[in-house]
Amino acid sequence: MKRLISLVLVFAVSLVILILLVVEATSYWVDRRNFKNSETESNLLVMRNDSSYDLVFLGISHARNFSRHRNHERIESILNQKILNMGQGGGICGPNEQLFYLQYFYSQGNKAKKIVYVLSPPFMFSVSLPIASNTFNYEPFRIPFVWQYLNFPAENRSERLMSMIQFKLTPTWINHIPFSYPIGTSRLEKLDSATVAKGQELAFNSGSEDMKRFAFSADILQQTIDLARSHGTEVVLFIPPALFGKWRGHEITKKFGEKVALQKGVSFYDFSETEFDPKFYYDHHHLNTYGVVHFTEKFLKPVLQ
């Protein structure tokens, strides 16, 4: 019986080691393809060690949108600054994992002059973003990253790491190559109030604003600011524009931004009602390439220089 147990243990350990070796191999295979920030939704595939950046973006899709469709190269040119975008779209990342990405960024010897945190109200209230299990699916398996995350206070940690490992064994990951559409040209013709109402319900999980979740998110944001400032990084917070103007929870988010600006010595801007031309949007709260360029030139550039 003891011999059987020993054999089972040896087999189990050997299987785990084999899986991890394959995961490491597929990660290396994808990592060596030299991705640009505009060519992947991954952060680690574009983050290098001991690098310096002028700007680092954090947030959800409203942040990541500054890099999609080759917008990354456009705003680097407009601002004349080196940029890393660690914002995560697709409903996969909440404030806590954004904090972890920043911790890992600094732990790898990287530096940033400024962090631009796109403070979308749904990001602050969401109960689903913090427990998304697919947050790290498109991140290569790196032992320092995984080890640090194992020691990081996180919701749904085990499921997130398991999903990360499993995804490395799929054709989708192995065939992940650098790709970006050259420009985002889709545009709206007009504001559709019914669509906006449905979108607000979806963003807030068909419920009222969750103040307990907001308080948790606000605490994480303050930890993020403290971490950045401890590394000599300035922080700029802004609420992004939307064709409909203000999200549900806007005033609460705005008051938080104004409060931390006073308490933490950071900059805060409310840009929610700055872009009302439908031609600048591909949906009611995401700017297309024309919108990203216009917003960066008219509003973002003046506050970052």
Regions found by a protein language model. Give the residues of each.
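Secreted/periplasmic serine-hydrolase-like ester/acetyl group-modifying domain
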Residues: 119, 128, 132-231
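Membrane/wall-proximal cationic-aromatic binding patches
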Residues: 14, 18-84, 89, 95-99
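Structural motif
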Residues: 54-55, 114, 236
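C-terminal regions of proteins
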Residues: 251-304
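N-terminal Sec-pathway targeting helices
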Residues: 1-16
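Membrane-embedded segments
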Residues: 62-149
